[in-house]
A protein has these predicted regions:
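Phosphate-binding/catalytic loop of phosphoryl-transfer enzymes
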Residues: 85, 138-246, 250-258, 354, ...
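ATP-binding/phosphotransfer module of carbohydrate and carboxylate kinases, centering on a glycine-rich
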Residues: 1-61, 65-138, 178, 198-200, ...
Length: 376
């Protein structure tokens, strides 16, 4: 995009107005012009366009101390919807949301242990069609979050580490059958987006760890994800223990949901967390300590300003998380000992809300592009 051309400038300013109303609520035309340093004719033109698109509505007269009362404008949050899909190892979740990310409809279907790409793909398409039929409001786009390797055009799964999926054009098929734009996004990117959109995360440098059935991590630097394809869950923390990857002593062998569940005859981590069995308690303490070891190494390498833990296993009772935090503080370099190590406020909703955030950004608000422009 040539930012210097008039049409591009109008496009950018339209997005700035839309994001202002989405983030901060009602404004008059004059307030928008002042806040974004736009001239009044340009502001009026942009507002008129947004009104015609149905993205913005006039709310009424603002309260003023004196003089003419201006008309306020607000985001028409129900004018468009997005559909976020989490293709998880145990469940596939679908969330239909408005422009503010409010959940209007949620559905969950079990993910088979080793799903057939064609069968499960068809189930996903049918559920997307069902979600599309229950509303008359336009769905701007569909985003599917997955831990798989994704093609450059974000339409196909190239390879999945845990399933026999190769070159599966999932998003392309969803788009063709639903007549709605669709893309794939890596789960780590979705979770980071969720923190920034829905948890108010404003740190420019932080490490995000997805501690769930499997373990992964991503470093965010200057609002950009680096190391999205890192293998955080396979950091060595022990000298024994065969991992599913074929390695020995990986973090996953001690702390991943699959490893903890296998150790106790398939019992879910949620149930294990409530157990008082000494063997279970010891296993969960070892998992917390192993995560502390991995975070100590990651912190020393990255120098991040914050560590955020997401995913299902991160919802262990507080005393296990406190044990992890204590281990980190005691063993990390003194200059890094005081950085926050916290659980995500979004708990186990991070991935599916992240798919919603990516959809909102891609098809409505384009905040990533605006952030990139600010850094030029």
């Amino acid at each position: 995009m040539q930012f210097s051309t008039p049409s591009s400038a109008r496009t950018i300013n339209r997005l700035r107005v839309l994001n202002l109303l989405a983030r901060e609520g009602e404004f008059s035309r004059a307030d928008i012009a002042r806040r974004l340093t736009l001239n009044k004719p340009s502001t009026s033109e942009i507002v008129e366009q947004l009104l015609q698109e149905g993205l913005v509505e006039e709310k009424g007269k603002a309260k003023t101390a004196n003089g003419r009362r201006p008309t306020t404008l607000a985001l028409q949050q129900g004018s468009r919807l997005v559909l976020g899909v989490e293709l998880g190892s145990k469940n596939t979740c679908f969330t239909l949301s408005d422009l503010l990310g409010n959940v209007l409809r949620f559905e969950r279907i079990p993910t088979p242990i080793k799903p057939d790409a064609q069968e499960h793909g068809l189930t996903i398409i049918k559920t997307c069609l069902k979600m599309r039929r229950i509303t008359k409001t336009p769905i701007a786009g569909i985003t599917v979050a997955t831990s798989a390797q994704i093609s450059n055009d974000s339409l196909s799964i190239l390879r999945h580490d845990h399933w026999p999926w190769e070159n599966v054009p999932l998003a392309k098929a969803i788009s063709e059958y639903t007549q709605t734009p669709a893309i794939l996004v890596h789960s780590m990117r979705a979770m980071v987006e969720a923190e920034q959109w829905f948890a108010g995360e404003d740190q420019k440098s932080f490490l995000y760890v997805n501690w769930g059935e499997h373990i992964s991590g991503a470093l965010v630097q200057d609002n950009t994800i680096v190391g999205e394809k890192s293998r955080f869950g396979h950091l060595p923390v022990r000298q024994t223990g065969l991992c599913r990857c074929g390695g020995i002593g990986c973090l996953e062998t001690v702390a991943a949901g699959w490893a903890l569940s296998e150790r106790f005859a398939g019992t879910s981590v949620k149930d294990l967390a409530q157990s008082q069995d000494p063997k279970v308690v010891q296993a969960l303490q070892e998992a917390a300590e192993a995560m502390g070891i991995a975070l100590t190494s990651a912190s020393a390498i990255t120098g991040c300003n914050k560590i955020i833990l997401g995913g299902g296993v991160s919802n262990l009772p507080d005393h296990y998380i406190s044990l992890l935090q204590q281990y980190y503080q005691q063993h990390t370099h003194h200059s890094l000992a005081n950085i926050p190590v916290v659980r995500s406020q979004l708990k186990d909703r991070s991935t599916v809300l992240g798919s919603v955030a990516v959809a909102l950004d891609r098809w409505v608000f384009q905040r990533r592009m605006l952030q990139t422009m600010q850094g030029l």
